[in-house]
């Protein structure tokens, strides 16, 4: 009989205990008072009410007040908020949306926030009011331990509708020491992605502008726009306002960056940058607009906004499909360099190009067609023969066909042909004339890859030979886009090594290379490449530093070595016949335990014909070391062997971070001009949950030891 009575109680509980959404109560023992309608549950007690789950050892349901009374420890899990509430006493409504909790603690698992309070009052789905509350995003392992920082408040009100938390009579404590009091402060809830408010402050000191304190204010303008304002004044009396506006549009987005300053001499200085992307245009085209303007040449570098010394204003439109690319650009350059003139450099450029790939049905292979036009305009109108006022309009076409096939013994044969055609109109330059030219190319290539695989390792050796023939076209055209030819493994088998259209590589030549690669289980990989160019005659198109001058080029070498994920080495060099180094570039990445490094070394021989009057010998080193789980030290060093000078280009950065706090102290040495350097010290401090998501901004979740 008792068994059937228990079944009846369990069946009737949802009918007269909890109103609203369906409720499920389970317990080891359940006692129902037929006179009062009260229910007492004990043992492992669980109530599930929609997204809320309550667990305790004992509770009483009061039928007259339609409430739940819990006299012992219990917890409530909210699956929507991903939040757990612990308390030692509670009086809750039957739907658990309203009530009073004593000695309570709330843990937001996703945002890692913890709030403890002497008393918590729940007022429906919207408000949760906490008296004598302590809040922190730091993980607290023991009840007696103190977090790195905390906020103690007389009252905390969590508004779940407006997604904000209000602190009344709040004291901010750092390592247990009170450092700040405010009678009222409202901050967004940690799950808010965007909200108006102050961002973390940054303190910067440099030997030119003194102490600067940055306190950005972020202002949302609806769901699709925002503004960030950063006013600051330094110890030298310079007043500055920085502003950034971002706007998402139906057809793209726009970003405006602006800063204006009044220096100690009452001089007004400013810069304005605009970047707009247009993603929805007719016929699937996209576009980009960039505008840059400054009040004077040194404002941005002196105030730490950047060292850009050429301003590029442009409008571009483009479309890319599987076998087609179309692009058109209007570009205007403004130089800030004292060694250049906006009148004599090509300040305005218009270019357009169409690239199309075709697959010929009868002959096979691939056919790439490129049509482009370009116009350069200079402001000068002196009509001199030195090209300082020269304006050029060019139209050109390029057709390239190539096909590969495998012949006997695994030899891969390839054939390619190319036709280039250009027409030039030259203005305001008596030394150059309008002209047209057509240049045909032909190439035959043979390569023989041989692979040997054995016991988890493989060897690949591949000799390559390519014969290229072309005419020697002596038409002289102004060279505007091919001033810096390069010779490396990426263009060894190209028809030419000039980057543009205005110059092309002449004559017959033989390109040779030998590739070797060793791979063992992907954990150890080594390889090298040797290459050389042999010509029938020296056409005197290249300077000595390119490695391409003479009938026989210098030796092109490229090597790489990878050991697991911790060591990587790449080296590229041009060697003369006597093995002296003409150019060398080495990249080395290495990591071991807590240490990681990335370095690059560059050596270029001087070449006055290319405007390089001194040899370049520079070492770049980036290194970082994790002392433990909380501290990291990183540095970036650039050493110029030619000038015998060391600079800290990115400086020295010491960072402390844990589950709730991140702080950075950095030293930077910047080059703001060819003769002046700026030393800068910066400090900023960030607390998890204030203006950012704690789980994304900070480093890790601390695990308590048992």
Regions found by a protein language model. Name each.
Residues 5-15:
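Bacterial N-terminal signal peptides
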Residues 9-10, 38, 67, 155, ...:
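A generic structural signal for solvent-exposed, polar alpha-helical segments
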Residues 10-12, 55, 178, 211:
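Generic detection of intrinsically disordered/low-complexity segments and helix-coil linkers/edges
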Residues 16-17, 470:
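Hydrophobic alpha-helical elements and their junctions with loops/disorder across both membrane
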Residues 20-142:
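Charged (often Lys/Glu-rich) extended helix/loop segments that serve as interaction or gating elements
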Residues 83, 89-102, 106-137, 144-151, ...:
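Outer-membrane beta-barrel proteins and related beta-barrel translocases across Gram-negative bacteria
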């Amino acid at each position: 009989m008792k068994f059937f009575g228990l079944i009846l109680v369990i069946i009737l509980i949802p009918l007269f205990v909890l109103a609203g959404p369906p409720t499920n109560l389970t317990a080891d023992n359940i006692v129902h008072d037929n006179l009062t309608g009260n229910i007492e549950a004990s043992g492992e007690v669980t109530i599930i009410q929609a997204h809320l789950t309550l667990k305790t050892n004992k509770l009483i349901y009061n039928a007259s007040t339609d409430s739940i009374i819990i006299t012992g420890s219990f917890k409530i899990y909210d699956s929507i908020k991903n939040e757990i509430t612990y308390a030692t006493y509670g009086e809750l409504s039957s739907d658990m949306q309203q009530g009073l909790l004593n000695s309570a603690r709330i843990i937001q698992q996703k945002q890692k926030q913890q709030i403890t309070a002497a008393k918590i009052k729940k007022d429906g789905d919207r408000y949760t009011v906490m008296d004598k509350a302590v809040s922190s995003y730091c993980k607290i392992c023991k009840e007696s331990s103190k977090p790195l920082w905390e906020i103690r408040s007389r009252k905390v009100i969590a508004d779940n509708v407006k997604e904000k938390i209000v602190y009344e009579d709040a004291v901010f404590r750092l390592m247990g020491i009170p450092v700040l009091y405010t009678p009222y402060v409202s901050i967004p809830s940690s799950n808010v992605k965007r909200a108006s408010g102050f961002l973390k402050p940054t303190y910067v000191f440099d030997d030119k502008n003194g102490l600067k304190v940055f306190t950005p204010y972020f202002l949302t303008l609806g769901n699709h726009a925002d503004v960030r304002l950063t006013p600051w004044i330094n110890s030298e009396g310079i007043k500055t306002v920085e502003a950034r506006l971002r706007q998402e549009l139906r057809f793209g987005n726009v970003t405006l960056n602006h800063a204006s300053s009044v220096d100690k001499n009452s001089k007004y200085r400013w810069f304005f940058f605009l970047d707009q992307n247009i993603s929805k245009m007719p016929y699937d085209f996209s576009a980009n607009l960039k505008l840059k303007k400054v009040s004077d040449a040194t404002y941005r570098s002196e105030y730490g906004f950047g060292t850009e010394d050429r301003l590029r204003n442009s409008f571009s439109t483009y479309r890319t499909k599987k076998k087609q690319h179309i692009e058109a650009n209007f570009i205007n350059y403004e130089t800030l360099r004292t060694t250049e003139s906006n009148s004599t450099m090509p300040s305005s450029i218009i270019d357009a190009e169409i690239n199309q790939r075709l697959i010929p049905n009868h002959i096979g292979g691939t056919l790439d067609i490129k049509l482009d036009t370009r116009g350069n305009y200079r402001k000068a109108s002196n009509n001199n023969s030195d090209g300082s006022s020269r304006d050029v309009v060019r139209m050109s076409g390029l057709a390239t066909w190539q096909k590969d096939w495998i012949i006997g013994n695994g030899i891969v044969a390839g054939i390619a042909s190319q036709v280039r055609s250009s027409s030039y109109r030259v203005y305001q330059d008596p030394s150059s004339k309008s002209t047209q030219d057509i240049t045909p190319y032909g190439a035959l290539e043979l390569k023989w890859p041989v692979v040997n695989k054995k016991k988890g390792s493989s060897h690949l050796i591949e000799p390559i030979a390519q014969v290229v023939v072309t005419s020697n076209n002596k038409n002289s055209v102004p060279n505007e886009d091919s001033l810096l030819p390069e010779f490396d493994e990426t263009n060894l088998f190209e028809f030419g090594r000039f980057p543009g259209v205005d110059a092309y590589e002449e004559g017959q030549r033989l390109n040779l290379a030998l590739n070797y690669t060793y791979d063992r289980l992907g954990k150890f990989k080594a390889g090298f490449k040797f290459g050389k160019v042999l010509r029938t005659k020296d056409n005197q198109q290249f300077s000595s530093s390119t490695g391409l001058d003479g009938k026989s080029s210098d030796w092109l070498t490229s090597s790489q070595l990878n050991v697991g994920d911790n060591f990587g080495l790449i080296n590229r060099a041009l060697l003369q016949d006597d093995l002296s180094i003409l150019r060398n570039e080495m990249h080395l990445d290495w990591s071991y335990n807590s240490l990681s490094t990335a370095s690059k070394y560059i050596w270029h021989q001087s070449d006055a014909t290319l405007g390089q009057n001194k040899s370049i010998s520079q070492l770049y080193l980036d290194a970082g070391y994790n002392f433990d789980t909380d501290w990291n030290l990183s540095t970036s060093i650039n050493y110029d062997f030619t000038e015998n000078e060391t600079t800290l280009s990115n400086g020295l950065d010491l960072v402390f971070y844990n589950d709730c706090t991140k702080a950075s102290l950095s030293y930077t040495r910047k080059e703001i001009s060819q003769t002046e350097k700026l030393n800068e010290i910066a400090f900023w401090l960030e607390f998890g949950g204030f203006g950012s998501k704690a789980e994304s901004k900070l480093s890790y979740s601390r695990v308590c030891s048992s």
